[in-house]
């Protein structure tokens, strides 16, 4: 009887033990479906076609609803005991909890009404819509047109929110808005065929579409540009000139806005995934800046210059470091990238299948944006990753920065990490939606250092370029916290960047504008890179001759983008496993 009772206990205990795991996986499925529903254009790029004719809802009511729904997910998540989950699901739970908590917290700040920065905005994101969608069938083109035709409603919503933001004191500083107007006016195309929105209709006709229907689709697209999109962008331009720009903020700091200090503290936590304070980060930046300055001094003297400053003057002004056409800059960039491609197997055991391409940054945004950026592709939609290069102001785009820049943006940096994440056997929300700046950008900055192993920094100028990029990210820690927590002005920030990096004036201006208009984001780079370098040093010391750099890199990338404490735990577990091999 006792044995039978024990057997009954075991039989009934199994479902009870499984219940929390089942509840958790059900929550994961519902949460992922929610993410797709709230991100209809991204869902299309992932191959989910349920929302093909929809665009995102930017409204504050939608923000409030999403915050409530995130809070409901969070309550359900907290009711599931962590101890009942597998080690893998405990990591999923921790990452999901952080993401949901940040969604709820972000919605409490008035800064949610600030819908654009000097780097991006709803109007710029929509102008790049075609870059992220498949165009293989007639249905693809029809759904794209349906989305274009909804832009005036999105634009009106965004302008209403921005008008409220102006009334309540959430406005970008005057000092950063010099190039913002062009990001609006540059999208307006008098000839619809030359519009960015029309570009998909210049491609070969889809196989399932006859000539007459294709001609009709092209006519509909021209109509959309002329009668739908151009008027919406013109309305935005008029609003910007008459209702936004005259009310731009005099202070460069987000702390001057209502609730700004609390908002900045949130942004620091969010972007670094740490509990570091602005003051602690500022001090780290000063130490790193001093260390890198000393290295730059050594390189300058070895190159025959009397000082670091003398070498930097030469790097900024010597014509031999610059090209005169966009095509030449893209060619030099492509040469570096193909060289790196051939060296990747020596540093990584697993490489992504998705390729990447190189394109110039669109003209309407190039003059006011950064040197380069990466846009992920989509294996499901047959879209390669894209490394965008700034080909404006060519006298400010030196060749010596191309190796470090390319390592960061393409491979082994962003493309390698993100395209690999898209292939990993992770919970779908982590595979497709999770990106922590401290990891993603920390990895990109760490990837620049791998140019040493690859032999790319083979001249003093290229080595100085790498060190300047290191100094640039160290300076971000000083400048971002200086502006938003310590009362610095833009002029102080620009001077610190000039004194501590070899960046050209155009780059410095664009970068400082970015830090001012996007508080905290720039902190993740150096904080993340320092953690990855520290973990590599820990592994090298612990494993000695057993340390395998390829296996270390594969381990760092094996879980996709994660908070830094999760990364540390996974590397420590790998070190223990390697010791036992």
Predicted regions and their residues:
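Sec-dependent signal peptide recognition
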Residues: 1-7
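N-terminal signal peptide c-region/cleavage motif recognized by signal peptidases
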Residues: 11-15
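N-terminal maturation segment of proteins
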Residues: 18-581
